[in-house]
A protein has these predicted regions:
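Glycine/small-residue-rich loop that forms an oxyanion/phosphate-binding "nest" at active or ligand-binding sites
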Residues: 83-126
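Gly/Ser/Thr-rich loops at beta-strand to alpha-helix junctions
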Residues: 29-35, 98-110, 134, 151-156
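Short, well-structured alpha-helical segments in soluble
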Residues: 74-88, 193-204
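N-terminal glycine-rich anion-binding loop in soluble enzyme alpha/beta folds
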Residues: 6-80, 154-192
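Solvent-exposed alpha-helices and their adjacent loops that cap or buttress functional pockets
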Residues: 16-21, 43, 118-121, 138-141, ...
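Conserved acidic residues
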Residues: 92-95, 144, 204
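Hydrophobic structural segments
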Residues: 23, 48, 74, 126-131, ...
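Conserved beta-alpha
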Residues: 113-180
Length: 204
């Protein structure tokens, strides 16, 4: 008990992480969200680890344009705390597991949102927002003309339309499902999504 630990038995901090050796991705999600974590758990590339942090949603009501705007304003105050917590696991990348605010204000708004995140996490770590990821994916597919399906109210759909246009796409149509709450987004039946795609977006 009283013997000193030998040098051979001392636990030293690893120079290179073996968990998440290719990437440790901190995923910042709303406290109401049940979809992003579920999806990430089904997509685990070798050498990549997910680390989830939630920001509190005090106002989950999305049933009108006014309530949707209140939701956007509220999360601006709680996201920084989740980022602060996430940084303690020393991630190599930040992924924003929410999309609404990343479209707000179009291309410039997404840039400003990313800069606010940088104020918390610093200049070195990579940051992926929903809007930036959408643009990168569409460009990878060579898309020029797009139609979009969102869970948002009309005020949110306008922001998506603006962002897509400002990033160079011809936007034929944006349809919002007008989900009542932040949690109900994940409860949308697949049949409802498919119906909208086939009957309102297909051909656009």
């Amino acid at each position: 008990m009283g013997e000193e630990m030998s040098d051979d038995n001392k636990q030293l901090k690893a120079q290179e992480p073996w968990i998440g050796a290719r990437g440790r991705i901190a995923v910042i999600i709303p406290s109401t969200n049940i979809g992003v974590e579920y999806d990430c758990q089904h997509l685990i590339p070798p050498g990549v680890s997910w680390h989830f942090c939630r920001f509190y949603i005090e106002q989950p009501d999305l049933s009108s344009d006014d309530m949707f705007m209140s939701f956007i304003e509220a999360i601006r105050h709680t996201i920084p705390d989740a980022l602060r917590d996430a940084m303690t696991c020393e991630p190599s990348q930040i992924m924003m597991g929410m999309s609404a605010e990343t479209f707000w204000g179009g291309l410039e708004g997404n840039t400003e949102f990313t800069e606010r995140l940088r104020d918390v996490v610093g200049p070195e770590i990579g940051i992926t927002t929903g809007a930036s990821a959408l643009d990168a994916a569409l460009k990878a597919f060579g898309a020029k003309k797009v139609a979009a399906l969102t869970p948002y109210q009309p005020i949110g759909d306008k922001q998506v339309h603006r962002f897509l246009e400002e990033t160079g796409y011809e936007v034929s149509k944006v349809v919002g499902l007008k989900c009542d709450t932040a949690t109900s987004i994940a409860h949308t039946p697949p049949s409802e999504v498919i119906d909208v795609i086939l009957n309102q977006l297909d051909g656009n």
